[in-house]
């Protein structure tokens, strides 16, 4: 039995061993593949997308993610929930918000995956909301479990929304109630792809780069 699970030191070596069993490769080929796989892990240096020059708080990161998601989807603004701990909510808490901060260091795709509400491969959602609906959501937060204990939204916008005007909103955290009241659209834009492009446009990022103007 040759295990060829996801581990990146085993997958390709496992397949090469299967080739050996089938007579399509030599043992030297298997050893060479194993050496290459081990080297790729031990000496792997992920690409640095940008460099953060000072600690960015959870809210700072939410502001940057909001700009990124809004611009990537052609939205007017963004509502980004924060993954704070709320007593009484299920232990899963909020998987659709910004949950961490960024420290002063080179930023890789792994660092982005930690702060992105979409993780590695989920897509960005958008929704059409009036300014009044936006204000209501800011007051109530993302009510993930329908119990009135909402996770706070951060409004990311170049202008203050007008109550009677309708906006396209990139949103991170859609409650069942909101999904029933409004049309939520899958933009088809993968959050990680958008983030790599957005953050990669900066050689360095500091708090001075957060404002959307």
Which residue stretches match the model-derived regions?
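Catalytic centers of hydrolytic enzymes
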Residues: 1-213
């Amino acid at each position: 039995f040759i295990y060829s699970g996801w581990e990146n030191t085993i997958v390709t070596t496992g397949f090469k061993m299967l080739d050996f069993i089938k007579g399509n490769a030599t043992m030297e080929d298997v050893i060479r593949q194993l050496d290459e796989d081990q080297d790729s892990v031990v000496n792997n240096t992920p690409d640095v997308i940008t460099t953060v020059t000072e600690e960015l708080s959870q809210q700072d990161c939410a502001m940057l993610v909001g700009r990124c998601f809004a611009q990537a989807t052609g939205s007017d603004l963004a509502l980004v929930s924060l993954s704070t701990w709320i007593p009484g909510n299920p232990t899963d808490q909020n998987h659709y918000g910004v949950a961490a901060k960024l420290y002063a260091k080179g930023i890789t795709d792994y660092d982005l995956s930690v702060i992105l509400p979409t993780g590695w491969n989920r897509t960005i959602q958008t929704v059409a909301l009036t300014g009044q609906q936006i204000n209501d959501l800011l007051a109530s937060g993302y009510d993930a479990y329908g119990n009135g204990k909402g996770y706070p939204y951060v409004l990311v916008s170049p202008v203050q929304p007008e109550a009677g005007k309708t906006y396209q909103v990139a949103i991170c955290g859609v409650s069942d109630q909101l999904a029933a009241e409004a049309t939520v659209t899958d933009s088809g834009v993968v959050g990680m792809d958008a983030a790599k492009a957005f953050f990669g446009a900066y050689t360095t990022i500091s708090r001075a780069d957060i404002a959307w103007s």
